[in-house]
């Protein structure tokens, strides 16, 4: 709790008393302002981290807790990325969710996109597989987007083509994609296979253009954050 006060003091704000979700909403707003307006990424992250730690007692008594927790995590992820600390992102998320299948869809989407952007899609492979195969996530908002991102930004770039085909044909694929989308996905996979045979050293350039033509449909859940173009990530 003192960490939360300290982080807000550094931002020049008077810390609200931590007596419920309304105060944590103010803290979340402060973190967002620090991140987006002031560009104070370290203090924004510290505010999110402290806010998450302060939520322990609230979790059992307020149904807004899940939304607040996700909000702190999403801002914290972006702040870490801006600080060029993207390697810490998923382990930090797991400190607060403990089980991979419990991570909200919008956070999975953000993590997949980040690790794809920095050229480390393998980091999210196992977590995405576990998440998609958890029965309680099948009906979750954003399930289809996680499946699309996993296919296009993890399996295909890694060259795991057989697993990509299996995903499309599996129960997950049937739930996530329409018949037309499944065919498009298979076309992308076969294009990757063809390019790998023709030029094993550099199969990805034309495929990247094809993937860009069929982006994952996040349906407005994800707004592409500043870190996607941050110079430190190149």
Indicate where each model-derived feature is located.
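TPR/TPR-like (Sel1-like) alpha-helical repeat modules
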Residues: 52, 158-175
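TPR/TPR-like alpha-solenoid repeats
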Residues: 79, 114, 153-154, 184-196
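Flexible low-complexity scaffold tracts in large eukaryotic assembly proteins
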Residues: 144, 148-149, 154, 170, ...
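N-terminal pre-first-transmembrane soluble regions of secretory-pathway and organelle membrane proteins
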Residues: 1-147, 151-156, 174
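Long C-terminal extensions of eukaryotic subunits of large macromolecular complexes
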Residues: 191, 196-234
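Polar/charged alpha-helical tracts
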Residues: 43-46, 187, 213
